[in-house]
Amino acid sequence: MLFRILLFKLFNKESTWELLLNNFEDITLKTFNVKDYSKVLENAISNGIKIYNDAYISCANKAFGYDRKHDNHLALLNKMFNEDRIEEKIVKCNTMEEAFNIIKNYPLIGNFMAYQLVTDINYSEIVNWREDEFTVAGPGSLRGIKKCFIDKGKMSNEDIIKYMYEHQDEEFKRLNLDFKRIGNRPLQLIDCQNIFCELDKYCRQAIPDLKSNRIKIKKRYSPKKEKINYIYPTKWKI
């Protein structure tokens, strides 16, 4: 399960997952072979198919000596699981931050990517960490926070995200907002972090005079025509 989560998240593209699934009996550590996976992905690239989602930038250095980003990511997975047996370490972690510190020490994994990975791991059944103890402000969130506050005082960016999480209900009431939860689940730290990121994107269009190192929206949203059947982590009990 952990291998599947990390493999999907490194590419973060459903069509890439389906491509691999169509070429192998199943996506598991038993079927994982760096050369075989690389061949499938390289063939897709040669046919003009994008294998990475551009929602966020994944690190693209040659940490494992390969010219292609996907080859370095496959080598990373091989080191994590076949050499280091990272799954044995992760399942023993008591907190999200503990797992974050393990993952972020690997090449090609920055702080925000490590946070995204541990968040997705925590949605699974293999661990059950608290979600309200740890967060990391990503690049978009940092820009969003900067556009909201002239002076943060002594608060860190993560402190601001935590404050938003802790005071959400009283602020909804104060602002007379009828906020619709997913089930009975309040906004979590990752949700508040994401809100600041989306705010940054919104402000680029709505208030372009606000200074930022990002000016344009790099991708336009195109809704799918097919109906989406949403599923939620079992532990949410929705």
Regions found by a protein language model. Give the residues of each.
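Phosphate-backbone recognition surface of nucleic-acid-processing proteins
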Residues: 118-176
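Short runs of predominantly hydrophobic/aromatic residues within well-ordered alpha helices
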Residues: 1-4, 96, 114, 138, ...
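Generic structural signal for hydrophobic core residues of well-folded globular domains
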Residues: 5-13, 80, 103-106, 121, ...
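Helix-hairpin-helix/helix-loop-helix acidic hairpins
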Residues: 57-107
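Active-site-adjacent structural elements in folded domains
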Residues: 82-90, 98-104, 125-129, 168-180
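Low-complexity, acidic/Ser/Thr- and charged residue-rich accessory regions of DNA metabolism proteins
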Residues: 172-238
